[in-house]
Each structure stands twice: as C-alpha cells, then as structure tokens.
Amino acid sequence: MASYPDVLKVAQNLGGSKVLGEDVASVADLERAVGRGLPFAALKYVVRHFPQRQKTRVQQIVVPRSTLQRREEEGRLRPAESERLERIARLATLAEQVWESPEEAQRFLTAPHPQLENQAPIDLAATDLGTRRVETLLWKLEHSLPV
C-alpha cells in the first residue's frame, strides 16, 4: 500500500537544491545525501515551516538540544540526524498531499491523533517504525480506507 511520496517534493521540503547543494531526482539521490549528512540549513528550512510553538519540538526530534549549536557550527548533520530530518520532510510531504494544504498538514502532524495512541504524528518521526505508523494512517486517509 505505502510507497515513497514524490521525492522531488520531499527534497523541496528539505530546501531543494539551493539548501541541499545538489539536485535530488530519485530516492537513491536522497539516500546518498542523507548518508553523507544533510546540511544544517535543511533543518532550519524544515523547522521554519512549523508553527512557532512547535519549532523547538521538531528540532529536538532531529538533534538533541545539547548538540544543536555544535551541528550549526559544523554546518552538517550526522547521517542518523539526517534520517530523522528526512522522515519529518517525508511525513510533511505526504500530509500535504493528503490534506491538500500546508496548514492542515501541519495541524495534523502536530496534534495528538487517536489512531496513534494520542501521540502527535511528528513525535513518531523520531523512529522508523513510528514513521511507518503515520505513513500507514496517511495512506489510509488518502485512499478513504477505514482507519
């Protein structure tokens, strides 16, 4: 049922080629970029699309508060941090596809959801399994399947 959302839109949600420093035209391209570590600017780009009260929450899913300044100085995230950021961008892309509105997508991502044990979808992006749960829910909503 689930497939990867449009990789170009995911890359765009990470800041596009201007922020990423390269063109991302396939999942393989994105995988290589994540494996090298995404630019810190991609985190800033993703975070600025969330409501002010959620920005710190999103940052902490990607990078612990104690490490944030160091990553900013280095200018690059570690691969594991990049994976978490990619998951957030992927969920945002899929939510925007389902809700057809960036505002509605952000509302969905940051509000507790009963099908996710009253956890906010964005909080589940910290792990691959949590992300899969959110993706499954979004695909069911997209295809009008029972949730």
Outline where the language-model segments fall:
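Non-transmembrane "mature" sequence context
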Residues: 1-147
